[in-house]
Amino acid sequence: MAHRHYAVLLFSRASNISPEDPEQDYYIHHYTYVTDKGTDALNYYASSMADHAELIDADTLDELNIEIQRTIDTVTAPDYIIDHLLN
């Protein structure tokens, strides 16, 4: 029986790391937690103190790696924080 694979991606707001230009805020990816246990992933996600977290899953590790990169690219895009946080 195949297991699903899970990842929790943690992001910080750039303004929290270096508050030089808060008008140009965006997310920085800083950690990815990968597991094959759904409850562990959910607990890690729920207890995260990150500014932003994403919980994703896939059938295989290869598919998960693709989704991880796609999520990082989406969340770290300059307009993401404007579209999803400020509106």
Regions found by a protein language model. Name each.
Residues 4-14:
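A short beta-strand micro-motif
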Residues 2-4, 50:
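A short, compositionally biased
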Residues 23-37, 50-60:
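A short, exposed loop/beta-hairpin motif centered on an aromatic-Gly-Thr core
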Residues 43-87:
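Short, mixed-charge low-complexity intrinsically disordered segments
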Residues 14-21, 63:
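Short, surface-exposed beta-strand/loop "edge" segments at domain boundaries and coil↔beta transitions
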